[in-house]
C-alpha cells in the first residue's frame, strides 16, 4: 500500500479541507514520517506574512526529507493567492492546486496534473472526511468565502464571495458523524453569522441551530468566528437559550476605538460592540474569545491606549493579538504605514496585558465544577489525563489535567463532571467526580 504524509497549516477551516482530501485518499496508508511517504501533501495558509513564510519553509523542508520518486503536492490558500509566482519559484514541487479541487485530489495525483478551478470548493453531504485529532470532536464548515470588506484582509480576493452550504447538507454530515461516535462540534466559516445571507436569509444561523438541536446524540456545540455586524441580538439570545450550543462566544473584534473601527471598515462602532459583548457576558457560564490587530495604518497612540484599557477591563476569557501584516489586494496596503518599531513596541505592551487577562480567567475556574471531555494523555505525561472544558474549542482554549478520579478509570471521549482544584501556569488541575451520560 502506498504511503501518504499530509501537513495541514493555518486555521481549522484548512483542517477540514485536509480531512476531505484524506477521505479521497483513503486507499493510502497514513504515515508520520515524510521520508517514508510516496505522496506528500502540504495544505498551505496564505493569510498573513508569517503564515506565508511558514508554508514556504514547510514545503522546502519536506522536499529535503522526501524519498526519491515521491510526489510533493502543494495546495491551499497560499497556492490560490500566488499561483503564478510559486509555480515559477518552487521547482521542488511536483503538483500544484488551489482551493477549488480538494475532492479531485485523487484524480490529480493519479494523472499527475495541476488543477486550478475558478470557484472555491464547497463541501457537500457526499464529501467523505477522515476526522483527525479527536475521536469525539469535529469541525463543521458551514460556508466558504466572505462578503465583508475589512481593510486589512485579503481573504475575499482568493476565497471569493460568501457561499453557504445547504442546511440539509450540514445536517446529513452531522448525523453521519454522530453515528460514527462524534458528539462535540465546532461550527466554522470565515464569517459564521452571515450564514445563508447569500441566499437572502438573515436568520440562517438561527434556523441551523434549530435543526441541529433535533439530532439525538450531540452533547455540545459551539459557533466560532461571529462577525460584529452580521451577529444579531436574536442570534446571541438563541445561543443562550440552546441546550446543545454552549455559551461560547468567539467574535474577533480587531479593535475598539471608533476611529480604528471606521478605518478598518468593520461596520460597527464601539457602542454596538460593547452592547453585544455585554449580552454575551450575561449568559450563564459564558466564555468569551476575541482577537485584535495592533499597528494597523491610522492607529494613533490614543487609539492603542483605548484598546489596552478595554482589554484590561472587560474580562475576556481568551484573547489573541496580532501585529498588522501589510497584504496585497487590501485597502490598507496603500495607506501610510505605522513604523515597524512602533508596531513591535505596542505588541509587547498588549501581549503583557493579554497574559494577565487570560491568567485571571484561568484563576477564576478554581473551585468550579465543570463538565469536561477526556482527550487522551496530557502534555505533562502519563500521570495526568488530558481533558477540555465542554465549553471550549479543541486545543486553542487550554488543557485540563486530571490526576484524581472518584469514578474509576476514565474513558477517552467520555464526559465527566470535574472539580477544578488548581491553576498551574494556565493549566487546570482537576478531580473527576462522576461520569455524565451522553444525551
From Swiss-Prot:
GO molecular function terms noted in the UniProt entry: 4 iron, 4 sulfur cluster binding; aspartic acid methylthiotransferase activity; metal ion binding; protein methylthiotransferase activity
Swiss-Prot/TrEMBL keywords: 4Fe-4S, Cytoplasm, Iron, Iron-sulfur, Metal-binding, S-adenosyl-L-methionine, Transferase
Enzyme class: transferase
Record-level GO cellular component terms: cytosol
Any one GO BP annotation for this protein: tRNA modification
Cofactor binding notes: Binds 2 [4Fe-4S] clusters. One cluster is coordinated with 3 cysteines and an exchangeable S-adenosyl-L-methionine.
Domain MTTase N-terminal per the UniProt entry, residue ranges: 2-114
Acetylation as UniProt keyword: no
Pfam families: Radical_SAM, UPF0004
Keyword presence, 4Fe-4S: yes
Subcellular location, record wording: Cytoplasm
Residues at which [4Fe-4S] cluster 1 binds: 11, 45, 77
Protein name, per record: Ribosomal protein uS12 methylthiotransferase RimO
Lineage per the UniProt record: Bacteria, Pseudomonadati, Campylobacterota, Epsilonproteobacteria, Campylobacterales
Gene transcribed to yield this protein: rimO
